[in-house]
């Protein structure tokens, strides 16, 4: 499970945690919702993006962290979300980081390629719903 998230060849590698004290281990999964007929297999399986929402695969990811001394575990299921590595794993990573950091996680815990996007999302969240994000910043709520 460690290699799924931390090895470049792992299906969850894009959702890894860089901070050595917070590294997680996990397993991606995809649950097929629909039947794929022999005729469809012969002509090529239709991609999730081209299917109606209710026929798309479910995305799954289970994980624990820190991997060397587990304190937290999570399971994320995104109904009709597609693949576990693209839909469920990033959500689980963010939940785990929030739990381990006790609030807003440090940007340095994310892969460098994600930091700009994550910083923008955190700022948008803070500006959109300041009363519900006070705990992200460690602020007291009145």
Task: Describe every region a protein language model picked out.
Residues 1-106:
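Active-site beta-strand/loop architecture of penicillin-binding DD-peptidases
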Residues 90-142:
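Short, gly/Ser/Thr-rich active-site loops of penicillin-recognizing serine hydrolases
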């Amino acid at each position: 499970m460690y290699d799924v998230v931390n090895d470049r060849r792992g299906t969850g590698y894009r959702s890894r945690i860089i901070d050595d004290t917070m590294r997680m281990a996990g397993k991606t999964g995809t649950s097929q919702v629909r039947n794929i007929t022999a005729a469809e297999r012969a002509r090529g399986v239709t991609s999730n993006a081209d299917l109606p929402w209710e026929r798309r695969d479910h995305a799954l990811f289970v994980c624990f962290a820190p991997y060397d001394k587990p304190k937290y575990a999570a399971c994320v299921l995104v109904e009709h979300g597609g693949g576990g590595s693209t839909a469920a794993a990033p959500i689980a990573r963010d939940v785990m980081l929030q739990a381990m950091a006790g609030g807003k996680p440090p940007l340095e815990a994310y892969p460098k390629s994600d930091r700009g996007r994550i910083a923008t999302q955190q700022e948008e969240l803070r500006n959109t719903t300041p009363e519900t994000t006070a705990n992200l910043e460690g602020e007291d709520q009145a």
